[in-house]
Each structure stands twice: as structure tokens, then as C-alpha cells.
Amino acid sequence: MLQFPPFARANHGPARQHRPTGPHPAANADNNAPGPPGPRARQRPPTPSHNVGRPRPPTPAHARPTIEGPHPYTGGMHDPTLSTMEHRDLVEALALSHVLPHETLPAEECLGRRLAVDLRSLIPLPPFTNSAMDGFALRREDLAGDGPWTLPVVADIPAGDTREHLLQAGQAMRIMTGAPLPEGADTVVKVEHTDHAPGVAQAPDTVQVRVAPKLGANVRVAGEALEAGSPVLTAGRLLDGAALAAAISVGHGTLTVLPRPRVVVVSTGTELKQAGEALERGQIPDSNGILLRGLVEEAGGRVVAHLRTGDTPEELRRALDEAPDADLVITAGGISAGAFEVVRLTLGTDAGFHHVAQQPGGPQGVGSTPVGARGRETPVICLPGNPVSVFTTFHMYVAGALAVMSGLVLPERGATVPSAVIARARVGWESPEGKTQFIPLRFVDEAGACSSAAAGLGGGEAVVPEAGVRWVEPVHPLGSKSHLVASLARAQGIGVVAPERGAVEAGEELAVVALVG
């Protein structure tokens, strides 16, 4: 399995908190100066270094981005171009500087959360020696010789009985499944092997045992399944019903879980309309809002507000000021090179904007901004407005940031930074030279004709998939174009094509971030 450069580098357990320092890789000595006045303008805090957590040789002076004109982080026209690695480092540094504390909750409230620490048994399992069957507890030595054997029944022990019982030689006690084995008993004979009928009935005065069991039969000894102190669950485990049952069964009433970062999602653009509203010329449904809400929840975050604003800085600033407290703001749209880029105009002194050498989703922004009535400084990640760009860049960067902020460091699918599998292209397609391509793909596991979605990509003849090999094809004939939102429902992975490649030929291998099992 190909592992992408990870956000969190610990092996197991909660992530350690790091405080990034240093300037942006493209910044110079004057780059921390405040920009021109704007809505709620103030001096921009230092942008995290792109070298946090990953030693890397210094970039030669001739290879560094050249910045001309106004500083790029105050709305200038000349944004630096970063590699996908450099942008990932900026997002990583932002997340590492805002790692959230663990939460301790009643176990019953932890469904769907992730365990923050390794869990060990507080008690043995079973916690006491008990009967594995409905029947009669006795001493095996009392069944000597040939049967049947008749014994007096001196007590009736239901499940949950807390009384102390002492079994004497030559006696029997009726016992139910799960009930504590009385002191002195070492064997349980099933009710079916006696003259006593199963079911609801009074305990008999005597019992006739017709089949002699082995010594220790139908007895569960305390601790035979699990000793106290034994490991039960590991940190990072998703707490489903089975995991919670295991935790409670070994004595845990509360659990320490990873936090779910609170996220404010912001869709920008006067052209956006609520789902189902009638559309006028130039208007489109706001698909980014529900897309981001779903992606955030799937990645372990919790959306506390979805804001939809127009293209004026005053409107966006007011919406952020009135938003609830959050741990992260994610914006969609308003960061490109147009005349009405509302996010850039509003957050120009708060966030760093740059271009990433990737397709789709070149324009990106990272920083922090005041949110809520108290003006709490909150991390912000700014994404482009095209839905395919939102989809791919969220999976490649933002999902990992949420995992880091929550302290999750285990590389589980859909929960941390992308891991890739190697697959082969069912058909060929073009890839832009000089840019990393993130292309939504579907897996093709059966031989046959090329799907209509992948037809006409211009990569030569389609290849018939071989058994035992994972094959992929684009979900849309136009490949990775950023406006193809309707095709995202078919996406099962994101192909990663290196910038120097230029094209993918049918049958060639490529890395694929799998979004499904």
C-alpha cells in the first residue's frame, strides 16, 4: 500500500500538540506586514512553516516562487504557486496548532465516537464462576458408580442471585444460566439430562441425574475468557455497538473519546439558491453546502452551522460574527482571481492565499479569522467553489486536518490522511503537465465493455480487467473538470497522477485513494 505523506506521524495513541513557527515558504522579511485596510482589517498572524514535522533541505533561491507587487496574503494579484506537499504542510501546521482535548463521556453516549486511549479490562470475564446451562449444580464425585443418581435439591439459584450458597456433599442446587456457582459445586448437569422438565416450574425436592457429565462440565470459571488488565480496544477504534458492549462488559462506565471538531461551513456566491428553490437565469443550487456537511460528518467532525452568503465582504463578515463558536471554518468559493472574490476580500489579512499546482482546485487558502460574538480566533481553510474541487481537496487535505485536530493518528480508512492503493487504468486519459491531477474514479472489477462514463477519454483502446487486479476508470468522460458535480455520486476513489506524467495510458498503474472498501 502506498502511503501519502501523513499529517500525524505518531504510531498509536493521541497526537502530540505542536506549535508551528516560521514564515510561509514564499514569504520574505516584509511579508508579515499588515495589508491595506479592509473589513475588520488587522495584522495577519504568522503563517505556519511548511517544514513542520518533516525535515527537508532548503529550497534553492532560483527555485523559490517570485513574488511581485502587493503581498499575496493581503489580496495581491501574484499568488505563490505551491506543490501539493507544501500546501499539505500548511494545512498540517494549522491543524497541529489546534489539537483539541479529549472528552470523557458516559459509555452510552459514545456510539459513533472514537476511542482516545487504549482500553483494558477492569474486571475478569466472566467476573465470577457461573453456570453455562440451566440445570443442577453438584459435586461430580457424588455421581459415583452406575446411574441414575438421585440427590436432594436444597436451593434454587436464579441469574442475578447475590446470596452466598454452600453445597454440601450429596446435595444438588437448581441453577440458571449465568447464575453464580455455589461454593462446593464443581459441575453442572443440564436439565435435559435429569428427570426434571425444562421450563417454568417450581424447584423439585429431589432430582434424578440420568447422564453423568464430566468434571467441570457446563461451568464458566472466573477470568477464563479475559483476565483483569487485559487489552480490549485500541486507541482510535470506532465505537460501534459491539465495541461499546465490550467496553461496558469489562467494567467501563465512562470512556475517553476523541473530540469531534465543531465546524462552520460557508457557501459563498449570490448565484446560490437553497435546494428545491426555483432557479432564475444565472442561479444554481447550493450543492457545496450539503457536500461539505456530509464530508465533515463522515470525517468525524460536527457541523454547527451552515452559512450561505452573497458576494459582499460585509455580508460574510457579519455571518461569521454571528456564527456559533467553532474549531474550524471551511469556506467554498470566493478565492480565485475574479472581481468579486468575497472570501479573499474579507479574510485577506487573516488567511494566506496561494495557488497549488494541482487539478482541480488550484486556488487555496489557509489561516485563521475571528468567529462568533466573542471574536474567537478560529482556523479557516478556504476551498474553491467548484464542487469537484471541494470534493477532491477535502479528501486530500481537510479530512486529514480534522483527524489531526481530533487527535486521531491511526491510519483507518476514511478517518485520517489519504492512503493509496495501486490500481490500473481501464482506459486512458489526459493529465495536465506540471500539475498533480486528482481525478474521481470508479473501480472496475468485471471484464466487459468500457462504461459510458469513461467512453471517449482518448486514451487508446480499453483494457479488459484481469482477475485479482484492481482496475479503475474516470467517473465522467471529461475527467477531472471541476464542475462535474453530478458524477461525484459514482466516485469510489481519487486517482493521483504525478505532475510530470502528462497522461495516463490504458493499462498503466497509478495511485488511488480509495473512498470505499
What function would you assign to each model-found segment?
Residues 79-148:
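Intrinsically disordered, low-complexity, positively charged segments
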Residues 8-66:
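Compositionally biased, low-complexity flexible segments
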